[in-house]
Amino acid sequence: RTPGAVDRLRAALDRWDMRGFTTYLTEEEDGDWLTGDDAAPFFALAEQRGLIASLSLMPHHLDACATLARRHPGLTILLHHHCHFGPRSATTRQDRPLAHAIASCGNVFVKLSGQGNVAGADEEYPYPDLDWLRAMMVELFPGRVVWGSDFPVSSRHTTYRQSMNAVLRHTPLTSAGREAAMGGTMARLLGLSQG
């Protein structure tokens, strides 16, 4: 997120067979970088090349991300950790309107990952206090939720199996929804064949 980002991305694309990239906005940032002049050519190139923009954002960044998603409808955006809703960001189910603008963008997907990162400090797997959050993500992003292990970082909070079971057992998905979340959707986004 420094000047010359588009040139660095172009050089990386010339060197490697990239499928996407990740960037992390800090809690202190307002999200303006996502829609600023420096980022515009960067995201335009990412859209042109079919990359997945994997973004770690906080709930207060979602309006800017919605603007980005509408400006670049061919850009797949993958948001980390349930959009960081939950006790860590001091958001509750009453903050649901923060997600509405981004949920209406069909090119935005959400990783059902990092529940230990968004949960309260005294909460433990299976994080029953986050039931509202899992339900909200499935409802607002139908067919656009994917599992992510967040491994090895998640090992501070859960085992690898627990990170899977958070989706398989504790997220209100249909059988087809679980299959999609556990690999089918990502395979489609990456252009991989299934089977």
What are these regions (language model features)?
Residues 19, 33-146:
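Catalytic pocket-lining loop regions of alpha/beta-barrel enzymes
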Residues 136-146, 155-195:
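Mid-to-C-terminal alpha-helical segments outside catalytic/metal-binding sites
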Residues 21, 46, 110, 150, ...:
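Conserved, mostly hydrophobic/aromatic
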Residues 5-6, 61-66, 164:
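Short, well-ordered alpha-helical microsegments
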Residues 16-28:
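Active-site groove signature of glycoside hydrolases
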Residues 1-3, 27-33:
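Active-site mouth loops of central-metabolism enzymes
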Residues 26, 82, 115, 150, ...:
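Flexible loop residues that form catalytic
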Residues 2-13, 94-95:
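Short, acidic/polar
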